[in-house]
């Protein structure tokens, strides 16, 4: 067997939480263009949020010394942010139509309990150490493996029955990973 192991977690608890969102959707028209602008703010909070975490979860007698991934509960977390989207269609003439869909999302995914131990890891020599968000993260100010800024644009030009389109997606730098 080769590669990293996926280790079970019999102590894994289900995550629970709540969310709320408020927004506005407005129709817009400029000349031959019409569409919608949608702006929303959101807030989510989780208890016992689950995260796939890298570490030495098996004993030193396991393949790769017990290094691999395991799902763990990381405690109380919060994700807040805003979403803005714009969709529209414009007629250039009787034969040509342009469709556009654009969006931007800002998220602030944080741990509300960064110093609380959420897992215990077997180290080399069978010693045990605590995992907290602060001591297991490359940047403990945001949740692991999440982007804070995401933007996307889809555009399509339709000429009679022929269409051609393009898509662009931007994800900012992923600031926090296991280390």
Where do the language-model regions lie?
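Outer-membrane beta-barrel translocator/channel fold
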Residues: 1-6, 11-14
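Gram-negative outer-membrane beta-barrel transporters
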Residues: 32, 36, 40-45, 67-178
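Membrane-embedded beta-barrel scaffold of Gram-negative outer-membrane proteins
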Residues: 13-68, 78-80
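Flexible glycine-rich, low-complexity coil/linker segments exposed to the extracellular/periplasmic environment
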Residues: 2-4, 54-67, 128-136
């Amino acid at each position: 067997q080769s590669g990293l192991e996926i280790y079970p977690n019999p102590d894994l608890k289900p995550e629970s939480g709540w969310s709320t969102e408020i927004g506005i959707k407005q129709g817009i028209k400029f000349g031959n263009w019409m569409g919608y602008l949608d702006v929303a703010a959101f807030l989510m909070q989780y208890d016992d949020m689950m995260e796939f975490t890298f570490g030495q979860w098996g004993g030193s007698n396991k393949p790769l010394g017990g290094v691999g991934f395991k799902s763990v509960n990381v405690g109380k977390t919060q994700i807040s942010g805003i979403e803005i989207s714009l969709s529209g269609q414009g007629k250039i003439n009787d034969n040509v139509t342009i469709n556009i869909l654009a969006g931007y999302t800002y998220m602030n995914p944080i741990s509300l309990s960064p110093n609380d131990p959420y897992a215990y890891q077997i180290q080399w020599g069978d010693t045990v150490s605590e995992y907290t968000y602060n001591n297991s993260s490359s940047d403990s100010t945001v949740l692991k493996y999440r982007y804070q800024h995401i933007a996307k644009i889809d555009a399509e030009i339709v000429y009679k029955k022929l269409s051609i389109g393009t898509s662009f997606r931007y994800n900012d730098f992923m600031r926090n990973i296991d280390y």
